[in-house]
Amino acid sequence: MLSATQPVSENLPAHGCRHVAIIMDGNGRWAKKQGKIRAFGHKAGAKSVRRAVSFAANNGIDALTLYAFSSENWNRPAQEVSALMELFVWALDSEVKSLHRHNVRLRIIGDISRFNSRLQERIRKSEALTAHNTGLTLNIAANYGGRWDIVQGVRQLAEQVQAGVLRPDQIDEERLGQQICMHELAPVDLVIRTGGEHRISNFLLWQIAYAELYFTDVLWPDFDEQDFEGALHAFANRERRFGGTEPGDDKA
């Protein structure tokens, strides 16, 4: 899956971006432009995943999180959902060994209980194979929704309260944050959405509280290393305030 790619160009400032999340949008529209069915676009999008993972691994990014299948995607036509599930199985079978060779740790975030037993087993084996790798952490959000993530975190705290190991007044942002997916990773610094839409679509609602947002009209199958570099360049030139004000600015 990974191949040697050039690091970001010399004129790109040190981007300081540790965790990038991508909403991979535009597969269906890309396929339509080619006169093909949507499944064709999803397969083409898998090639862009390879490019993005390779680029991230070679350019100082610690974690890459990709929105592969939202909890709302079950509402799509059954034929498309079936094609996506088969593509997921194929990707795990064909790519995980390459990820492992390149020291990438693979994790699936989301409620995998709705997937069939074959896919769940592939997920478990893939995560186990790469669990001790120390390079890029690749998170694939599958049957994931930001609201679901927060609710499952609250439910875990409620169970602790019910068991008598936690008092309600002990619940705070830190405790809840420890129950949310990817809590052990660096916070998301940059969210990229391809395909021209300007919305979050229930993705990582907790984790992107202070992330920079970058929207591009490029459809996901066309998103390449230059596009990724452009997003990092934009990020590097933004001033992040985390709710504060510009240094030296005493005016609210």
From Swiss-Prot:
Active site: 25, 73 (proton acceptor)
Catalysis performed (reactions): 8 isopentenyl diphosphate + (2E,6E)-farnesyl diphosphate = di-trans,octa-cis-undecaprenyl diphosphate + 8 diphosphate
UniProt record, GO biological process: cell wall organization; peptidoglycan biosynthetic process; polyprenol biosynthetic process; regulation of cell shape
CDD domains: Cis_IPPS (cd00475)
Annotated EC: 2.5.1.31
Required cofactor(s): Mg(2+)
Entry's family note: Belongs to the UPP synthase family.
Entries under NCBIfam families matching the protein: PRK10240.1, uppS
Protein name: Ditrans,polycis-undecaprenyl-diphosphate synthase ((2E,6E)-farnesyl-diphosphate specific)
Species this chain originates from: Salmonella typhimurium (strain LT2 / SGSC1412 / ATCC 700720)
